[in-house]
Amino acid sequence: MDGPIDAQGGFIRSRGMKFPKNPEIIKGRVRKLLRGNAYEDKETNAALRVVREGDVVLELGGGIGYMSTLVATKRPIKSVHSFEANPHLIPYIREVHAANGVRNAEVTNAILGPRKGTADFYVRDPMLGSSLEVLEGEVDPPSVKVDVLNAKAVFKDIKPNVLICDIEGAEVDLIPQLPLKGLRAAILETHPQWIGPEGINTVMRAFMDAGLAYYHRGSHGKVLCFRTEW
């Protein structure tokens, strides 16, 4: 039964999934949306429309493990591979997977890029507001070094056919560099407040050039969905 709090007091339940109560991560708006079964609502609806049996899902921006747990528990996928830059979220994502009996998910503390290396990742409170960029008005925000993995090598190794991406504005730089032609579907949360209309056009053009078309039934507001065929 979906509801605010697990009977044992250790979890919040959302859409049938269990999320350990961690006051450093599950708080404020995130907690409220989870309890109301409304967390990542647009992405959830898109994923349930396009993810199919046997899919290999690549997720960029693992967050609290919500989307990876959703696709692994609601659809008989082959596997889901999540890449999350924030090292403080990795243990929690694994807790969520374990709590929900997910055994076909892999979590990596890294981001993808055109070549291997490292990058500065700026950690904020709340954690889900952390990003690769210094925000306007910030002065010397705390940061950690995060590994950058070669995107083409990762795609070649995992061979995903579905991409789910929410990387806080970094999509405008990363998406055009990804080998998207092997994908059947993609779900992308855009951040127009940071990347502007030119950035949105750049991202959409990259998917269209790879043979994916805008899928209106899975798209809503800032969440864009693409498929090779409807």
Please tell me what each predicted stretch does.
Residues 1-230:
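Phosphate/nucleotide-binding beta-alpha loop and adjacent structural elements of enzyme active sites
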